[in-house]
Every structure is written in C-alpha cells, then in structure tokens.
C-alpha cells in the first residue's frame, strides 16, 4: 500500500517490522501443544520442537513486546512520521492485535462444535485472520495520507481477503500436501476444527473463496485503480498452494 501511494520502502520498514513481530508471535503460539499442536511450519520444525515449549512461549511473548517497542522507538524517527501519525498508527494496530487473539480464542472454543454457522465462522476469522491484514493495509494508507474513501476501500478489501485466505487455508488442509504447504495436512480434521470445508464442502468453499477474492479486488479498484501492488498480492494469494 505504501509503494502504491508513493512512500519509500525504507520509510515503511518499521511498520512492517512491527506487523511481522505480531504475526510471527501468533504463529509460534498457534503451533504450541495447547493450541494446534503442529510440528512443522513452513517446512521447518516448529519452535517448541526445536527448543522446548517454555522457550517457544517466551519467544512469542518477546516478539509481541518488541512490536510495541518498535512503535515507541523506531516509527517516530522515520521521515513521513511524527508523534501524531505514530499515535494514529498505534490506534489501528493495537486493537487489531487484540482482535487476532480474541479470534484465536473463539476458534479454539469452536472445536468439535456441531452447530456452528457460516456467520459464526466469518466472525471468528474476521478477527483471527483478517484483523492483522486490516492493520497492515490501513497503516500503509495512513502513512501515505490516503483519503477517507481510500481508507474505507482498504479496510473493505482486507476484510474480504482475510476471509478468503482462511477459506483457502481450510481447502488446502484437505486438498494440499505436506511438502507444498510446509505443515501437516489434515490438522484441522485431527483437531475436529470448524472449517468452511466441513460446513459447505470443498467445491462450495472454492466458489466462496473466489467470490471473496473478487470482492477484495473490487474494493481496491474502485478507489485506487486497477494497476497497483495490492492487486498483485491478491492474485498471488489466490494462486497460492501453501
């Protein structure tokens, strides 16, 4: 988003670092035995397998804290920013990091549920998966001085892409293979998780993912045109096999 709106790469680095710290910590914790109990992540042994459970837990804690340290120490030093903009960025970032955790809690509570609806699943994944994507797009928009309609378009796009990513993840957990995914297939079924595939079947889930990606594209093109980096990322996500 920053590139699309003419913010130099170096001036986006601190924000990217903060987002990646939150993302990485969420994956380290998500893999723990108390949660998804996964032994592979991106084709490599997970943190609690390489080290131990306590070390993985603390590593995640440090990454979360580091994200906010970057906000206080790094972000105000970059050219486009001042304390007012840094405060606006934090007001976007912090609640969405919290929503990500809330979504994970709801996801864990939904395991083995026999009566979860599509609306319930979407509510979970707007927080668990979509919130951090929403933060990334909105923060790029804020840094670049995006207009209110442009920020609304970025938020709308993020909400659709976040859901689409999760639907696609559910599909790949059934149709993919461990070598491509870099993590074990069938882990959702093993944990009896509530998924879009479980709810509607593979074919309907594929159609739903396609419609969500289309909505995300539409939100961006309406305000930001049809030649931009966000559309390229959306296309990559749609084609991904891992």
Regions found by a protein language model. Give the residues of each.
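Mg2+-dependent prenyl diphosphate-binding active-site environment of isoprenoid biosynthetic enzymes
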Residues: 1-221, 225-238
């Amino acid at each position: 988003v920053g590139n699309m709106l003419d913010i130099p790469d170096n001036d986006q680095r601190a924000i990217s670092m903060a987002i990646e710290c939150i993302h990485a910590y969420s994956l380290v914790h998500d893999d723990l035995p108390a949660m998804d109990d996964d032994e592979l992540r991106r084709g490599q042994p997970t943190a609690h397998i390489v080290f131990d459970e306590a070390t993985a837990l603390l590593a995640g804690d440090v990454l979360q804290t580091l994200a906010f340290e970057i906000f206080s120490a790094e972000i105000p030093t970059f050219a486009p920013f001042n304390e007012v903009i840094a405060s606006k960025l934090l007001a976007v970032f912090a609640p969405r990091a919290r929503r990500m955790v809330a979504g994970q809690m709801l996801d864990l509570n939904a395991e083995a549920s026999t009566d979860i609806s599509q609306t319930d699943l979407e509510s979970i994944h707007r927080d668990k998966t979509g919130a951090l994507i929403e933060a990334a797009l909105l923060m790029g928009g804020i840094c670049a001085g995006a207009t209110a309609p442009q920020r609304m378009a970025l938020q709308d796009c993020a909400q659709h892409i976040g859901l689409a990513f999760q639907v696609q993840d559910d599909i790949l957990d059934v149709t993919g293979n461990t070598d491509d995914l870099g993590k074990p297939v069938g882990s959702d079924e093993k944990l009896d998780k509530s998924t879009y595939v479980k709810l509607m079947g593979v074919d309907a889930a594929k159609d739903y993912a396609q419609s969500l990606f289309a909505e995300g594209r539409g939100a961006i093109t309406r305000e930001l045109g049809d030649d931009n980096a966000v559309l390229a990322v959306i296309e990559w996500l749609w084609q991904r096999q891992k």
